UniProtKB/Swiss-Prot annotation:
GO terms for molecular function: ATP binding; ATP hydrolysis activity; DNA helicase activity. It catalyses: ATP + H2O = ADP + phosphate + H(+). Its EC number is 3.6.4.12. This is RuvB-like 2. It comes from Xenopus laevis (African clawed frog). InterPro entries: AAA+_ATPase, P-loop_NTPase, RuvB-like, RuvB-like_C, RuvBL1/2_DNA/RNA_bd_dom, TIP49_P-loop. Keywords: ATP-binding, Cytoplasm, DNA damage, DNA recombination, DNA repair, Helicase, Hydrolase, Nucleotide-binding, Nucleus, Transcription, Transcription regulation. Belongs to the RuvB family. It is found in: Nucleus; Dynein axonemal particle. GO terms for biological process: box C/D snoRNP assembly; chromatin remodeling; DNA recombination; DNA repair; regulation of transcription by RNA polymerase II. Has single-stranded DNA-stimulated ATPase and ATP-dependent DNA helicase (5' to 3') activity suggesting a role in nuclear processes such as recombination and transcription. Proposed core component of the chromatin remodeling INO80 complex which exhibits DNA- and nucleosome-activated ATPase activity and catalyzes ATP-dependent nucleosome sliding. Involved in the endoplasmic reticulum (ER)-associated degradation (ERAD) pathway where it negatively regulates expression of ER stress response genes. GO terms for cellular component: dynein axonemal particle; Ino80 complex; MLL1 complex; NuA4 histone acetyltransferase complex; R2TP complex; Swr1 complex. Forms homohexameric rings. Can form a dodecamer with ruvbl2 made of two stacked hexameric rings. Is a component of the RNA polymerase II holoenzyme complex. Component of the chromatin-remodeling Ino80 complex. Component of some MLL1/MLL complex. ATP binds at residues 76-83.
Length: 462
């Protein structure tokens, strides 16, 4: 009796994408032209022309390195784009300038003091660009000869022939270099570089002259020109690290492991002083340069009087980044005191700040922001639905209307629709309450909730 082999069907799993859509993932920059004039709609930014122009001036001063140790406060009502302006500045600065964003409540921890958390945030925002020159050998591999001992034991020896367009040289190889060449699968026709100090081999690709060696090649195969000039060259390598990373590595044995685990703990001031002295020495010798970055503290009114006192002192340091703060508070109590102050910030710190104010969005700007968010979230919406959603945003809040986009899209897909209509918006609006309707509901049914007002005369104290 013939038996049939069962065919195993491979299981296919959906992998959730890591790239999530955040509240400010549509921001690409500040949307300014070369003359620092803001465009009405550009790079995900809408409206707030005066605030964006002011942020652009600050941005230029940061890029020129002329404003280190300064502080800027972005103040405005909730939902007026304060964090968006800060994120736009971070995008415009690029990856070379360190940008650290924290919330005011993040510094309160049981593991470390408030001043230590602020110091680490300051040090993360200051970069050090270290330059070093290395000698490399760069050329096209002509031939690799490896002589193995006849007995099978003993050290391997060999010869490596490299060439450029102007010269050709034979190098003697030791055991470790042979192992490196074997590991990298180097063969004739490859263009490689060898770091003379470390012996590290890097494959740059295959030479164009060897393009016809094989009929079929993988997509990862890259063809490059044969190097010209001398085989041995001096190359300048630039490393950019933050002062905090140097602190952590030098704070303990195998401190570099703490960079990955995040368990940095408190770092002694003596370690930081030694690092500051060494960095100053490198700067005088021309080996390194300081890059003043940006520290952004959102919800700055959550800091207490001790933190504000520390910020006053830290901003006077010669190694201080640009400090950008954001708050949505008016005249309120300074945390840790009984005194009131504008934005909940002490007057002596307010004197040091350049204050940028933001204003509420009008109907046209609100509609444009909602359209940008729909594009970011891949949601198709009819013009009437945009109008209804804009009206909801003006009557309630911009954040609430933005949160309805994804919910309305899901309702639309459930009814097999391709475009979000007014009925979808109305349905999610009735399902999810905004702040004002929720407050009204609480007022109507407050007696039905627990712990509303406990009446002492009904309690049995016997």
């Amino acid at each position: 009796m013939a038996t049939m082999a069962a065919t195993k069907v491979p299981e296919v799993r959906d992998v959730t994408r890591i790239e999530r859509i955040g509240a400010h993932s549509h921001i690409r920059g500040l949307g300014l032209d070369d003359a620092l004039e803001p465009r009405q709609v550009s790079q995900g930014m809408v409206g707030q022309l005066a605030s964006r122009r002011a942020a652009g001036v600050i941005l230029e001063m940061i890029k020129e390195g002329k404003i280190a140790g300064r502080a800027v406060l972005i103040a405005g009502q909730p939902g007026t784009g304060k964090t968006a302006i800060a994120m736009g500045m971070a995008q415009a600065l690029g990856s070379d300038t360190p940008f650290t964003a924290i919330a005011g409540s993040e510094i309160f921890s049981l593991e470390m003091s408030k001043t230590e958390a602020l110091t680490q945030a300051f040090r993360r925002s200051i970069g050090v660009r270290i330059k070093e020159e290395t000698e490399i050998i760069e050329g096209e591999v002509v031939e690799v000869q490896i002589d193995r001992p006849a007995t099978g034991t003993g050290a391997k020896v060999g010869k490596l022939t490299l060439k450029t367009t102007e010269m050709e040289t034979i190098y003697d190889l030791g055991t470790k270099m042979i192992e490196s060449l074997t590991k990298e699968k180097v063969q004739a026709g490859d263009v490689i570089t060898i770091d003379k100090a470390t012996g590290k081999i890097t494959k740059l690709g295959r030479a164009f002259t060897r393009a016809r060696d094989y009929d079929a090649m993988g997509s990862q195969t890259k063809f490059v020109q044969c190097p010209d000039g001398e085989l041995q060259k001096r190359k300048e390598v630039v490393h950019t690290v933050s002062l905090h990373e140097i602190d952590v590595i030098n704070s303990r044995t195998q401190g570099f492991l703490a960079l990955f685990s995040g368990d940095t703990g408190e770092i002694k001031s003596e370690v930081r002083e030694q690092i500051n002295a060494k960095v100053a020495e490198w700067r005088e010798e021309g080996k390194a340069e300081i890059i003043p970055g940006v520290l952004f503290i959102d919800e700055v009114h959550m800091l207490d009087i001790e933190c504000f006192s520390f910020l006053n002192r830290a901003l006077e340091s010669d190694m201080a980044p640009v400090l950008i703060m954001a708050t949505n508070r008016g005249i309120t109590r300074i945390r840790g005191t009984n005194y009131q102050s504008p934005h909940g910030i002490p007057i002596d710190l307010l004197d040091r700040l350049l204050i940028i104010s933001t204003s509420p969005y009008n109907e046209k700007e609100t509609k444009q922001i909602l359209k940008i968010r729909c594009e970011e979230e891949d949601v198709d919406m009819s013009e009437d639905a945009y109008t209804v959603l804009t009206r909801i945003g003006l009557e309630t809040s911009l954040r609430y209307s933005m949160q309805l986009i994804t919910a309305a899209s899901l309702v639309c897909r459930k009814r097999k629709g391709t475009e979000v209509q007014v009925d979808d918006i109305k349905r999610v609006y009735s399902l999810f309450l905004d702040e004002s309707r929720s407050t009204q509901y609480m007022k109507e049914y407050q007696d039905a909730f627990m712990f509303n007002e406990m009446k002492t005369d009904t309690m049995d104290t016997s």
